[in-house]
Curated annotation (Swiss-Prot):
The lineage of its organism: Eukaryota, Viridiplantae, Streptophyta, Embryophyta, Tracheophyta. The gene is HY5. CDD domains: bZIP_HY5-like (cd14704). Residues 114-142 are annotated as: Leucine-zipper. Residues 35-46 are annotated as: Interaction with COP1. Residues 1-105 are annotated as: Disordered. InterPro entries: bZIP, bZIP_sf, Hac1/HY5. It comes from Solanum lycopersicum. This is Transcription factor HY5. When it is down-regulated, plants exhibit defects in light responses, including inhibited seedling photomorphogenesis, loss of thylakoid organization, and reduced carotenoid accumulation.
Amino acid sequence: MQEQATSSIAASSLPSSSERSSSSALHHELKEGMESDDEIRRVPEMGGEATGTTSASGRDGVSAAGQAQPSAGTQRKRGRSPADKENKRLKRLLRNRVSAQQARERKKAYLIDLEARVKELETKNAELEERLSTLQNENQMLRHILKNTTAGAQEGRK
């Protein structure tokens, strides 16, 4: 009897009980697998909802209009419940842990790339040092040849 009175008050904003039972069951089955972490861990508020809406869990389909009116003002004044604070803290810790793990993975990938670049640059540096040594030896030999050639040409003029 009380459910009929409650549903007639909220009839303008909610579907009829037959629509609610058929469509909400289907809608709930579709939505149930897609609930976010917030929805799964949320403690249902007894008075924080508008008159005639279903309960926060959305599982029973019973209206919470007449049950939670007295605690509506006190719940909002007190702020978050300890369970909500704990859930929020745990969620923050989990996000932080995931973020830290991702940062460690990025750092590891960066260091691997950096080490590969170091090896590449060391190899290139060794090749360049070898080439420098070869060119210096060649330059020294050419200077010696030039010196001998110019010295021999000067003796030939005399």
